[in-house]
Structure formats: structure tokens, C-alpha cells
């Protein structure tokens, strides 16, 4: 590849040198020196623009001598600068190469991915610590928000009622991480051994939440929840007595937050707490926006005046009166909407009471949370981008299984992002070791869910994979395909279930699949159409019709016509006794007698023998 690019640069250098010497180039000459795979008109225009920028004109055909003489002042004194030509050739070559590489989305993705440097073990730990710090700042902000404590206590109550698993509420303790690390480090497990186990179980497909998680000690959780509940009750009591800004209230609120941050909350619960705070902040901002609209758009109060006077007065119900007393030109209009503004302020006061915080505190808590989230998100992004190559290397092993390579990469990236969220650097393993499990889990699950035209449940995919693996082993062992009985014995499963699994495991095949060496016929041509009558049935029906007509010919014309009408032979439909009686102008009873007599004649062996062979014995 390097030699090819060097040769390309040499050709372009000669082209530029030629253009500098003669002062012009033709489109044909430029086209001859461009790569064959460069077909994008925009890229070609950019290249010609760069050539024009060097003072070389590009023409459809070579200009005549008179035109060259007219331009002699511009071209005759031009010197050929080899260095400039080399630099220009390198730039154009790079542009060409870039253009050729941007047509394939996989190449584009890999080129962009390759610009990010790989992380060392120390780099992984540094990013993991930044993620941890950001999440800690988020939880610290949530801890100061009283409704977060209320929600945590209510979720724990649901756990006590059996409606929540403990790990759906609390997954550990932040202040015991160091102790957990010391315990983990004493276990003699290496990254390689984990990877080996993963390789052996490559065909298994499980739930994304099947990752082994060791829950916290229930007794310890109960003890800490009890302490949190006690402190929170004390906070509510003091708040009701003194309000949000009293020193004792602030002190107890900090004590509640100190206990709150010791819990390592589950990701769904953390998201719920964050959403709760964001909704509250949005409500506060919504009321302020309405007041801003009323004051500036309706009353025409200058925006600067509003902002200056509104600050620290969001819940001051006297603010409107004070603004009106300033006797500005907008004061009368402000008086007309006084009740509306006061209503919005009262709603903000109600929010303060509901949250046990001032509006300023709510905004500050939100600012802390947003800052922590941004810090964690930035670090997660860096960790993900630095490990995209790992996803590529794993996804390559799962090609030709029903999903496109880009789809495999996408699913693997989703698993990588989950791994980043759940990674704990203190356990001593490299991130790549931990992420491999999540990436494979995401890819294998997506293959199980999406690869087949007819979806098969994931648990059945596991059984099919196990069956295929054992079948291959027995084929190598015995030199033949294993029978269902042998597979049932090997897998310790009922034989009928093995047969069902083998039937389900069949892959769909296209009806356009060529058949034979000439490939002039397709599989669909040999599939029986159940809606079309077979030739045997057609022949049988024709013979039956002829035989019935012959038998009826042996009866009297009246008897034959009665039977034809009663059974619809050679007619559109059959007829009732009354309908046949009207046709012959006789009673129903007479028609019944004629019919019975005719059938007795047909049952005679001389006539019935001809029809008996058509009876379907089966």
C-alpha cells in the first residue's frame, strides 16, 4: 500500500511539474494521473481547484500558440520548485486516498476509530476514577434533595413487602469499596482464566442482567436504612418548626445526605432519582418563564429591569406591588396581571414546601448534579472510544451468522457501553477482560433475536447451540451423524424433545435456490402446491363422472332425472323433494318413492360393482 501511494505521488509530481513548465494542463492529462476509483465529481473539482491555486490553468484542449503568447507574462518567468511540487503531490495524493476510502462506511468507521489511542492499565484506572467521581458528585447532589431520601425509603419498603429485590434498590456500599477490594485481591484469579471460561461457553446466550452480582448484606442495609429514616424524620420535624434556612435544619439535612451517599444505588433507581430532580427543576423554571412572559411580553416591562428586580424575589409576594409603585410606563399593565404573577409565585412557594428546600437550593443541587453527570459522561465516552477496537475483534468471530458486520459492531458497542457503566476498577481486572463478556453477551443475544427469519426464543437457541456442539463432537467420534436416541442419551433429554429441537433448528431456504448443474430450475418448481388438484385425483374424478352417467343411463329417464336433481349431478346444485316435485308436478312423497326405487336399482350388484371401486377405503 505504501509503494502504491509513493508511485501515485510520483505521477502527480510529474503532472504538476509539467503544468508549471508549460503553464497549463488539459483535463485529459489530469484524469490520466488520478486514481481509477476516484469518481466523486466534488472531489475532482477540489483537486482541479488546488491545481488552479498553483497558477496552473486547466483547459478542455491545449491552448493555441497565440493564447500562450498573450499569457507569456504570467507563464514565461515561472520557475519549477521541486519542493512545492512534492508538497502539492503529497496533498493531492492524500486527498485522492481520502476520497477513495470514504465510500465504504466500514472503512470510514474504522478510520475514525483508529484516531483514538489505546489505553494503558493506568489510563483505564484514571478514566474509571473520573467516572466514579462524577457519579459520586451526582449522588452527593441527590443526597441533599429530601425527596430522593423519601423515594429510597419507599423503594426499600417495597422490598420488605416482597415487591422488589434488594439489588433493585441497593447494590452495595460506597464506604466499603476498599474492604471489598482487599477481599477480591486475595482471590487468585487471572484475566486469562476468565477469558478461557468465556471462550468455552461461547455459544451460550443469556439475559443481559445475568451478570453475576453479589448483593449487599441485608442486615447491614436494614441497619443503615433505619439510621437514614431516623435522621430524615428528625429533619422533617425541624423543618416544620424552623423552615429551610435554620442552622439546625441545614445540619440535620447534611447528616441525612452523609448517610444517603454511603449507599451504592442500582442504576435504575439512580436514573429515577435524577429524573425526579429534573422534573422538579423544570417545574420551577416553568413558573419563572411564565412570570417572565407576563412581565416582559404582556406588561412590556424591560427585560433588564425584570431580571435585576426579580433576582432573589421569586417567592416574594410583594414584588409586584413594589414594581407597580415605581410608577413606570408599564406599571398600569403590570397591575392588570398582578393576580396571574402572584399565582405563579404562590405555585413556587408550594414547590419549596413540597421539597423542603428553597428555590435557590433546588437550582444549586441541580447544577451540582448536571456537572457530575457531564463529568461522568465525558469519561465514559473516552472509555468507550478507546475500546472500539475490542468490539471489532470480537464481532469478527460472529460473521456469517445472519447479521451484517455493521449490525454486529453496533450491538457490540451497546454491550461495551453497559460494561463501562458497570466496570469496577478496584476489583483488579483489566477493563478489556470485563468488557469482553458484555460485548459477547450483546452480540450473541442480538443474533438469537434478529438473525433468523422466524424468531426462536433465546432459551431454545441455547439448546440448539448445545445440540449442534454435541452433534459435531459425536460426528468426529463415530464418523457419522448421531441419531436422536444417541443425542437424547448424551444430553440427558427426552427423545421427543430432541426431535422437536432438531425440527426447530432447520434454517429457512430460499425458493429461488438453483437446482442442478445447469441452474435453469429452482427449488420452488419442485414444491407441491396443495391448492392444485393432483393429476391422479383429476383422472379419478373424470372416470367417476363417466361411470355415474353410464349407471344412470340404465334407469328410466324419470328416475335418472330425479337422482340428478336430488344429488346435483351435472347441475349447479342439488334440489329438495319439494323442488323436484314442482318440476314433475307431483307430491314430495311421490318423488321420495321414485328416489328410493332408483337407489334400490343402483344397489343391485350388476350396477353397484362399477361404482364400488371408487370408494375411498382409507
UniProtKB/Swiss-Prot annotation:
Compositional bias (Acidic residues): 197-211
Region Sigma-70 factor domain-3, annotated ranges: 462-538
Regions recorded as binding DNA: 577-596
Region (Sigma-70 factor domain-4): 551-604
Region ranges (Disordered): 197-217
InterPro entries recorded: RNA_pol_sigma-70_dom, RNA_pol_sigma70, RNA_pol_sigma70_r1_2, RNA_pol_sigma70_r2, RNA_pol_sigma70_r3, RNA_pol_sigma70_r4, RNA_pol_sigma_70_non-ess, RNA_pol_sigma_70_r1_1
Task performed by this protein: Sigma factors are initiation factors that promote the attachment of RNA polymerase to specific initiation sites and are then released. This sigma factor is the primary sigma factor during exponential growth.
Family listed: Belongs to the sigma-70 factor family. RpoD/SigA subfamily.
Assembly and binders: Interacts transiently with the RNA polymerase catalytic core.
Name of the featured protein: RNA polymerase sigma factor RpoD
Organism of provenance: Xylella fastidiosa (strain 9a5c)
Lineage: Bacteria, Pseudomonadati, Pseudomonadota, Gammaproteobacteria, Lysobacterales
Gene that this polypeptide is encoded by: rpoD
